[in-house]
């Protein structure tokens, strides 16, 4: 499934505890757990999470950099 399809399907979601987001961008594979909030708009996917420092950190990824996205059990 390409990133644009995900963006059209949902605009904001959070994974259930038994699922992870597998995201491939810039040639590397990343695995995110249910602690992230995922938002999609017309140009990018946004991943937000509260880290150990207590602050919310946000990563904006333009769709053109995403090679694959998948929700997996685990």
Predicted regions and their residues:
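Acidic, aromatic-enriched beta-alpha/helix-loop junctions
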Residues: 44-67
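Short glycine-rich, low-complexity segments
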Residues: 1-29, 72
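Structured surface patches comprising rigid loops and adjacent beta-strands/short helices at the edges
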Residues: 35, 61-74
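Generic serine detector
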Residues: 11, 16, 35, 48-49, ...
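Acidic, low-complexity, intrinsically disordered interaction modules
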Residues: 29-51
